[in-house]
Swiss-Prot record:
GO cellular component assignments: cytoplasm; cytoplasmic stress granule; cytosol; nuclear stress granule; nucleoplasm; nucleus; ribonucleoprotein complex
Molecular function (Gene Ontology), one example: RNA binding
Subcellular location field: Nucleus; Cytoplasm; Cytoplasm, Stress granule
Gene responsible for this protein: TIA1
PTM annotation (N-acetylmethionine): residues: M1
Pfam families xref list: RRM_1
Name this polypeptide is given: Cytotoxic granule associated RNA binding protein TIA1
Domain of life assignment: Eukaryota
Coiled-coil stretches noted in the UniProt entry, renumbered to this chain: none
Region (Disordered): 354-386
Disease / disorder: Welander distal myopathy: An autosomal dominant disorder characterized by adult onset of distal muscle weakness predominantly affecting the distal long extensors of the hands, with slow progression to involve all small hand muscles and the lower legs. Skeletal muscle biopsy shows myopathic changes and prominent rimmed vacuoles. Rare homozygous patients showed earlier onset, faster progression, and proximal muscle involvement.
Tissue and organ distribution: Expressed in heart, small intestine, kidney, liver, lung, skeletal muscle, testes, pancreas, and ovary (at protein level).
Result, substituting E384K: In WDM; results in a mild increase of stress granule numbers compared to controls; impaired stress granule disassembly
Length: 386
């Protein structure tokens, strides 16, 4: 029975910069892919490709998750692939009915799953809400471990809606799970910003930061920003190691396990619409053991980033709008003679604390430069001022 179910997807309206390797990387996050065949139209039309999965359920989940998603600035069209033999049967409407039934399933995203939760567990948890066509926990292909989220597909829309409403926040395996529609909402009308946004190329973005930088800044989601939303948006591009969201500021940071995955995410998500907001994506700040970002700053025209999870964005005044309280700020004085960002003396002490790295000359720079009499290697709240 499984062998008779379709496993190959048509992926169209692709950018000419998209490669088979990128398509495989994106679609393999949903399920193991057997192969990908890119078709380049010599007549000048947009390229398209066919992606074949090992199992029908993975192909169905990829259809739900990837149709309408932007890849390198273009909204791709995903559908079941048809063969010449199936096209001949269209007159009997059998193929049309089969395809329509597959597309009429309603897919629910289930996030924040405990590592021990299996496909059978989520299927059993959602079974009381109606007839389920498919359920699965997404696993990492390399380790075989759960990625912490999954999908449940219902035959009936109302069953899916009821499951989303009733199961959101419920406990499953020691964690409160999150639920939402797996498919995206209809795209909002393009704003002036989105229409005028320059499309980034992968080669340009991947070279903007050092190979050790795996952090993406995503800003502009001024309402509805959650960790679940960011995980759902960025998980197709690679393994996510950490997500930090700041809903009151409208931005988040997503750290991947590889520089290449982060670059693909920046290229694909920048300028797209999330929850009705056009988002901006840049490289996050590199940590202290990475190369000095000042040289990168001069190459790409962005100011030096601030904070351990800072972002390449705007000027110093703009950065002040985005940095949350309790994180590193542009300038510090020494303990005993410290200034806030407005330059007012805040603290007096008879003896300044020299810190564990006293005597080590820090690098000089426009941001975080040492003030007069400031001890080397001084830290504030655990963050170095260099």
């Amino acid at each position: 029975m499984e062998d008779e179910m379709p496993k190959t997807l048509y992926v169209g309206n692709l950018s000419r910069d998209v490669t088979e390797a990128l398509i495989l990387q994106l679609f393999s996050q949903i399920g193991p892919c057997k192969n990908c065949k890119m078709i380049m139209d010599t007549a000048g039309n947009d390229p398209y490709c066919f992606v074949e999965f090992h199992e029908h359920r993975h192909a169905a989940a990829a259809l739900a998750a990837m149709n309408g998603r932007k890849i390198m600035g273009k909204e791709v069209k995903v559908n079941w692939a048809t063969t010449p033999s199936s096209q001949k049967k269209d007159t009997s409407s059998s193929t049309v009915v089969s395809t329509q039934r597959s597309q009429d399933h309603f897919h629910v995203f289930v996030g924040d799953l405990s590592p021990e939760i299996t496909t059978e567990d989520i299927k059993a948890a959602f079974a009381p809400f109606g007839r389920i066509s498919d359920a699965r926990v997404v696993k990492d292909m390399a380790t075989g471990k759960s990625k912490g989220y999954g999908f449940v597909s219902f035959f009936n829309k109302w069953d899916a809606e009821n499951a989303i409403q009733q199961m959101g926040g419920q406990w499953l395996g020691g964690r409160q799970i999150r639920t939402n529609w797996a498919t995206r909402k209809p795209p909002a009308p393009k704003s002036t910003y989105e229409s005028n946004t320059k499309q980034l190329s992968y080669d340009e973005v991947v070279n903007q930061s050092s190979p050790s930088n795996c952090t993406v800044y995503c800003g502009g989601v001024t309402s509805g920003l959650t960790e679940q939303l960011m995980r759902q948006t960025f998980s197709p591009f690679g393994q996510i190691m950490e997500i930090r969201v700041f809903p009151d500021k409208g931005y988040s940071f997503v750290r991947f396990n590889s520089h290449e995955s982060a670059a693909h995410a920046i290229v694909s998500v920048n300028g797209t619409t999330i929850e009705g907001h056009v988002v901006k994506c840049y490289w996050g700040k590199e940590t202290l053991d990475m190369i000095n970002p000042v040289q990168q700053q001069n190459q790409i025209g962005y100011p030096q980033p601030y904070g351990q999870w800072g972002q390449w964005y705007g000027n110093a005044q703009q950065i002040g709008q985005y940095m949350p309280n309790g994180w590193q700020v542009p300038a510090y004085g020494m303990y005993g003679q410290a200034w806030n960002q407005q330059g007012f003396n805040q603290t007096q002490s008879s003896a300044p604390w020299m810190g564990p790295n006293y005597g080590v000359q820090p690098p000089q720079g426009q941001n975080g430069s040492m003030l007069p009499n400031q001890p080397s290697g001084y830290r504030v709240a655990g963050y170095e001022t260099q």
